[in-house]
């Protein structure tokens, strides 16, 4: 069962991931994110880098469908919430692996130069690509950057995702990973 805090955070994340705002998560939503990243990185329209990034962006989505035993390629918001609220789909034992996989996906997608850290600029790009209000990017970065060294490591990203996906504490630092989930609306 989801607490109200978790329901709000997960609904907010669903709205962010729903790039075309049709109320469903679909492969096109994830491909659109890849296209935006490719444009920022100025990858040629037919480059292997562009294709690799598109494949990377779809990997997590395919895994979501697999985890949900879905034959249909669309995920509705109620299905999304059920995924995270059901102890049969994501139980405490599998949550750790799931959080790592999700955090690593986002981390690798936005570590644009491959230096194994997320810089402030790369973090800002994540906000731009997902149309998240930039007003909250600085506080989000500061809260996730646990050691205040001006960069986000994979372990810091994992901790943030653990907070965001699993914590019912509205003050958890990782809740800010995608901006202010409590008052902001995904664009």
Regions found by a protein language model. Give the residues of each.
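N-terminal alpha-helical segment
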Residues: 6, 10, 103, 119, ...
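Eukaryote-specific detector of the first structured module of a protein
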Residues: 1-62, 67-70
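Boundary/linker elements of alpha-helical solenoid repeat scaffolds
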Residues: 41-48, 82-92, 119-122
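Glycine-aliphatic tripeptides that mark coil-to-beta-strand junctions in extracellular
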Residues: 23-27, 75, 116-118, 150-152
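EF-hand and EF-hand-like Ca2+-sensor regions
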Residues: 60-112, 125-139, 143-187
């Amino acid at each position: 069962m989801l607490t109200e805090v978790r329901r709000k955070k997960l609904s907010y994340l669903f709205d962010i991931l729903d790039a075309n705002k049709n109320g469903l998560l679909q492969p096109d939503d994830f491909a659109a994110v890849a296209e935006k990243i490719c444009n920022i990185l100025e990858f040629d329209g037919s480059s292997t880098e562009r294709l690799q990034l598109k494949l990377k962006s779809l990997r997590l989505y395919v895994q979501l469908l697999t985890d949900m035993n879905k034959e249909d390629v669309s995920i509705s918001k109620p299905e999304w919430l059920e995924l995270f609220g059901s102890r049969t789909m994501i139980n405490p034992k599998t949550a750790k692996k799931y959080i790592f996989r999700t955090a690593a996906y986002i981390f690798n997608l936005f570590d644009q130069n491959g230096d194994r850290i997320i810089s402030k600029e790369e973090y800002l790009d994540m906000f731009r690509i997902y149309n998240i209000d930039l007003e909250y990017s600085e506080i989000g970065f500061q809260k996730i950057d646990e050691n205040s060294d001006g960069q986000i490591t994979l372990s810091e990203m994992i901790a943030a995702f653990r907070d965001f996906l699993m914590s019912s504490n509205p003050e958890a630092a990782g809740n800010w990973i995608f901006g202010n989930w409590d008052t902001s609306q995904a664009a």
